[in-house]
Protein backbone atom coordinates (compact mmCIF):
# COMPACT_ATOMS: atom_id res chain seq x y z
CA UNK A 1 0.00 0.00 0.00
CA UNK A 2 1.49 3.31 -1.05
CA UNK A 3 0.81 6.78 0.19
CA UNK A 4 1.04 9.99 -1.75
CA UNK A 5 2.20 12.91 0.34
CA UNK A 6 1.77 16.35 -1.16
CA UNK A 7 4.66 18.73 -0.52
CA UNK A 8 5.59 22.17 -1.73
CA UNK A 9 8.58 24.46 -1.92
CA UNK A 10 8.48 28.19 -1.31
CA UNK A 11 9.31 31.26 0.74
CA UNK A 12 8.32 31.22 4.39
CA UNK A 13 5.86 33.99 5.14
CA UNK A 14 5.57 36.26 8.17
CA UNK A 15 2.11 37.01 9.68
CA UNK A 16 2.21 40.42 7.95
CA UNK A 17 2.36 38.74 4.52
CA UNK A 18 6.06 39.46 3.90
CA UNK A 19 8.75 36.89 3.22
CA UNK A 20 10.69 35.71 6.28
CA UNK A 21 13.93 37.71 6.15
CA UNK A 22 17.35 36.23 6.80
CA UNK A 23 19.93 38.94 6.02
CA UNK A 24 21.21 39.30 9.59
CA UNK A 25 20.47 35.75 10.78
CA UNK A 26 22.95 32.93 11.58
CA UNK A 27 23.93 30.54 8.77
CA UNK A 28 21.49 27.71 9.63
CA UNK A 29 18.55 30.02 10.49
CA UNK A 30 16.48 29.22 7.39
CA UNK A 31 17.15 25.48 7.55
CA UNK A 32 16.03 25.51 11.19
CA UNK A 33 12.92 27.58 10.44
CA UNK A 34 12.02 25.25 7.57
CA UNK A 35 12.37 22.17 9.75
CA UNK A 36 10.06 23.79 12.34
CA UNK A 37 7.25 23.64 9.75
CA UNK A 38 8.22 20.08 8.71
CA UNK A 39 10.22 21.09 5.62
CA UNK A 40 13.22 18.96 4.66
CA UNK A 41 15.69 21.81 4.17
CA UNK A 42 15.99 25.50 3.41
CA UNK A 43 18.40 28.33 2.77
CA UNK A 44 18.69 32.11 2.60
CA UNK A 45 17.87 32.89 -1.04
CA UNK A 46 19.17 35.83 -3.10
CA UNK A 47 16.00 37.81 -2.26
CA UNK A 48 17.34 37.64 1.29
CA UNK A 49 14.43 35.50 2.39
CA UNK A 50 14.08 31.93 3.66
CA UNK A 51 13.25 29.40 0.93
CA UNK A 52 12.15 25.92 2.03
CA UNK A 53 11.83 22.51 0.38
CA UNK A 54 9.22 19.78 0.80
CA UNK A 55 6.93 21.52 3.25
CA UNK A 56 3.42 20.23 3.96
CA UNK A 57 0.70 21.93 1.94
CA UNK A 58 -0.80 23.53 5.07
CA UNK A 59 2.23 25.84 5.48
CA UNK A 60 1.49 29.38 4.27
CA UNK A 61 4.06 30.52 1.74
CA UNK A 62 4.62 33.85 0.00
CA UNK A 63 3.13 34.12 -3.48
CA UNK A 64 3.49 37.08 -5.82
CA UNK A 65 -0.16 36.75 -6.91
CA UNK A 66 -1.49 37.04 -3.35
CA UNK A 67 1.22 39.30 -1.92
CA UNK A 68 -0.04 41.51 0.94
CA UNK A 69 3.38 42.63 2.22
CA UNK A 70 3.48 46.35 2.98
CA UNK A 71 -0.26 46.84 2.51
CA UNK A 72 -1.16 47.16 6.19
CA UNK A 73 -2.81 43.76 6.44
Swiss-Prot record:
UniProt main location, coarse: secreted
The protein's name: Toxin Td12
Signal sequence interval, chain numbering: 1-7
Positions of modified residues (Arginine amide): 71
Note: Negative results: does not affect the cardiac Nav1.5/SCN5A, the peripheral nerve channel Nav1.7/SCN9A, and the voltage-dependent potassium channel Kv1.5/KCNA5.
MF GO annotations: sodium channel inhibitor activity; toxin activity
LCN-type CS-alpha/beta domain ranges (all copies): 8-70
